[in-house]
Amino acid sequence: MLGWTLVFLVVAVIAGLFGFTGIAGAAAGIAKIIFFLFIVLLVISLLINALKGKSPRL
């Protein structure tokens, strides 16, 4: 999921460099949404593992 965020971020940067501000804005917005979704899922996963008493896998 974090990989998709990076893909949309790269698309936004390239589109911004070429002057496609609409595409750049949309791609940056999508990247931001996916990034925050990733953070929320990470926190939920950490909380569930902490409540179950499992130690994190390294």
UniProtKB/Swiss-Prot annotation:
Superkingdom of origin organism: Bacteria
Membrane topology: Multi-pass membrane protein
This protein's UniProt keywords: Cell membrane, Membrane, Transmembrane, Transmembrane helix
A GO cellular-component term linked to this record: plasma membrane
Subcellular location as annotated: Cell membrane
Transmembrane residue ranges: 6-26, 28-48
Claim: Transmembrane is one of the keywords in the record: yes
Entry-linked InterPro entries: DUF1328 (IPR009760)
Pfam families, alphabetized: DUF1328
Similarity section: Belongs to the UPF0391 family.
Name of the protein described by the UniProt record: UPF0391 membrane protein Shew185_1413
Organism taxonomic ancestry: Bacteria, Pseudomonadati, Pseudomonadota, Gammaproteobacteria, Alteromonadales
